[in-house]
Amino acid sequence: MIIDGHSHACGRFLTPDSIVKTLDTNGVDKVILVPGELNSKSEYSLPNIASIFPRRNVVKVTNYLTKFVMILTGKVKNILIGNEHVYELTQKTNGRVIQFVWITTQINKPSNYLDNKKKDWNFKGVKLHQCWESFSVDSDFFKEVALWAENNDIPLFIHLYSDSEVAKIIEYKKKHLNLNLIIAHLFGIELFIKLNFKDENLYFDTSTLQLISKNRLMNAIDFVGADVLVQREMEFRVN
């Protein structure tokens, strides 16, 4: 089974028909989906920055730009509506959409929201994004969401903003080995390697081609082990 492990519900993943068409065209069985730009069919072309700076974590640059745009537009306020939209897509695509719920700081009690939506939607993972809004790994908000995910054996997928947040999440993960944690875009893989920190419940998302160089990808494979990474990834995704 082939699963797209990181997509947003906009562009070609906005409607049931376009999702099925995209998956079929690319020979993909399912997609892990979170909210995106609400009701937008727009497609954005991203230059291959990674090829220019193959040894750099260029996601840092896109993080700054994303945060600036989010401050100007306030689009994070649409994420909860986006969660509803992703659930509707799961109901109209015959099992081909796997829902991850995106949690934002606008939710007063994240654990209650997650409890209720788990009953209603049976989602398969939780998403956090430090570029769309400001919160830290050492905040009560993060700890509540992460603890809920750990206690419910639900993967937590996080897009980190900075190197300092990478250091914090490594320290958090050392104390929570049962948390199934996915780090988006190989962010901070260099620090994981430097500290030689890995465990059987730690995963790294490798999207996307324009942001992840072959050099950094090979370093990650050398560190984790290609066979182990693929096996873990497939077991997690299918289950």
Where do the language-model regions lie?
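Short, flexible active-site-adjacent loop segments at beta-strand->alpha-helix junctions, enriched
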Residues: 29, 37, 103-105, 132, ...
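Acidic-and-aromatic substrate-binding clefts and catalytic sites of carbohydrate-active enzymes
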Residues: 9-16, 39-42, 75-78, 104-111, ...
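H/E-rich (His + Asp/Glu) clusters that bind or coordinate divalent metals
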Residues: 13, 180, 186-239
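Hydrophobic faces of well-ordered beta-strands that scaffold small-molecule active sites
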Residues: 3-7, 31-33, 97-101, 124-128, ...
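An N-terminally biased module of ancient metal coordination in phosphate/nucleic-acid-related enzymes
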Residues: 1-78
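Active-site gating/metal-coordination segments in enzymes
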Residues: 57-157
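Distinct, well-ordered alpha-helical segments
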Residues: 16, 109-118, 137-143, 164-176, ...
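Glycine-enriched alpha-helix->loop->beta-strand junction motifs that scaffold or abut catalytic
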Residues: 27-28, 120-125, 144, 148-155, ...
